[in-house]
């Protein structure tokens, strides 16, 4: 599953926060917008008219051009990832700067930007040690801006939480400056939006986290948006054999386009590990769980050769567990590691991914299998739930 973290607040916490936010921002200037909202678990998403407050100190308002429809957004609507509702969805967005707050010098009106759901402070232990994707500031801004407030309000004036500190399934959004990356204006914004999560998460899992080596063997479980990018990350890194694993023939066919040398449909199969071990000629050097299920992580670990590395990429439900044999782990020298947001360094990695796309090496055009208007958002989520291959993108107006 595409990367995000959930946080469950008590009703008292939410009510207290809402009252504080309402008092603080009653007099703020706002921008009317339409946004895609989740109000109740398991219910269809709705398109609502909201108000987006103008940027405060250290913040930027963007006019969205496009937003990818990510499985993490779906997980927030069904409770797989726990988020306080109501919630403005979206964390995979690209757009144009519409206004800047006090003290903002990195961005100017008219700049093209991509959202990053990891808010990087640059000061904590993780940022200072070269692991900004683990920045503690992000943990304080899972459904708000880093200051604990929101800039989004519904028609009744009630505050709306924002998914992953972004909430970019909206015509306008106000984000903290640390949640944005400036990009080349020549880059198509609907393609750029994909880099914000699905591409960065999958590609980065292969290139940044696992550091796939040329000539190696890799197995990728799950060929959704993240899995396809893990496949092409392995391909660009020079893996000699890349096995794509899924239950959908359509997704497996698409995986070939992204660099898979072999495919394996697990539908009805019981001896998955043995079959993949044989297919890879004695096990894989790298295996990726891009679905987000404990049992699939176990399968990924099991298909490794001695000394191999399994990477869990998708975010599982909080109660899901991984069970491994401790003796087996010790004597095989295998490694199991997590990859959050593809171990991203957004300010460095986003421009590099764009350069790869513009040179023809990174496939983004092929990733988009359908675009939707904001009014078609419920259909976009239904298609995602049904397992439509590739990535759906919501396009706002005519600026993509």
Question: What is the predicted function of each stretch?
Answer:
Residues 313-314:
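Acidic carboxylate diad motif detector
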Residues 24-31, 298-302, 347-400:
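C-terminal hydrophobic helical "lid"/dimerization subdomain
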Residues 227-228:
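N-terminal Rossmann-fold NAD(P) dinucleotide-binding loop
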Residues 308-309, 334:
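Glycine-centered, small-residue-biased loops immediately flanking beta-strands
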Residues 273, 277, 281, 318-370, ...:
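C-terminal substrate-binding/catalytic core of Rossmann-like NAD(P)-dependent dehydrogenases/reductases
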